[in-house]
Amino acid sequence: MVISFMTRAELLLWPAANNWGEARRSALNQHMGLYLTLYPDERTCTIWAAIVDRCRRAGHPIQAADAWIASTARQWGCPLVTADFGDFAAVEDLEIVPIR
């Protein structure tokens, strides 16, 4: 499975933001080793800009971090698995797999 660089960055923030102990930090790092992290290139940046612009014009602005996640998924043709369906609902041509 793959994750966006932005998802990886958000996951790396959790331990500091939530005062995790060393055991939880270690478990997260081990778990993240199961995923390939996809990093942006010029095409990702172009897709990101289009997503941000289209969402803004449609009256549904998207957070920059969410646009990075969506642009990575769209570029690689990956479904976006998320518990935050609403954050991505206005993004066109994106397969969203909601989790609960």
Regions found by a protein language model. Give the residues of each.
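PIN-domain endoribonuclease scaffold, especially VapC-family toxins
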Residues: 1-75, 79, 89-91, 95-100
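Conserved acidic donor-binding loop of glycosyltransferase catalytic domains
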Residues: 83
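Flexible glycine-rich beta->alpha loop in the catalytic core of nucleotide-sugar glycosyltransferases
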Residues: 86
